[in-house]
Curated annotation (Swiss-Prot):
The modification Threonine amide is found at T87. It comes from the Eukaryota. Expressed in entodermal epithelium along the body column. One of its GO terms (cellular component) is extracellular region. Residues 19-59 form a propeptide. Its main location: secreted. Residues 1-18 form the signal peptide. This is Arminin 7722. It is found in: Secreted; Target cell membrane. Keywords: Amidation, Antibiotic, Antimicrobial, Immunity, Innate immunity, Membrane, Secreted, Signal, Target cell membrane, Target membrane. Antimicrobial peptide with a broad-spectrum antimicrobial activity. Keeps its antibacterial activity under a wide range of salt concentrations that mimic physiological conditions of human blood, which is surprising, since Hydra is an obligate freshwater animal with nearly no salt tolerance. Does not affect red blood cells.
Length: 90
């Protein structure tokens, strides 16, 4: 969604300030290429991070246990957890 809104914004700016249709096409093409390259770099960084995490079997076990916990199941217990934590304090 971010890419689409960025492209539309650039298209509007290009239409306002461009001298010709070719300038508009070139500007949009450059922005799309830059956005694609940025996304690929982010994905590459994420893949590198995931490769490091996968090598540790204990990390996977904790991550798997954390995924099983659903936020909706935990939310009703949050006030009780806070009260239990604060009971020993003055």
């Amino acid at each position: 969604m971010r890419s689409a809104s960025l492209i539309l914004f650039v298209a509007i700016v290009a239409l306002t300030y461009a001298r010709s249709y070719e300038d508009i096409k070139e500007e949009i093409r450059n922005e799309v290429e830059n956005e694609i390259l940025d996304d690929l770099e982010e994905e590459n960084d994420e893949l590198d991070d995931n490769a490091q995490e996968v090598s540790d079997p204990r990390a996977r076990r904790w991550r798997r246990a954390f995924r099983r916990i659903r936020i909706r199941q935990v939310v009703p217990y949050i006030p009780h957890i806070i009260k239990a934590y604060q009971t020993g304090k003055k």
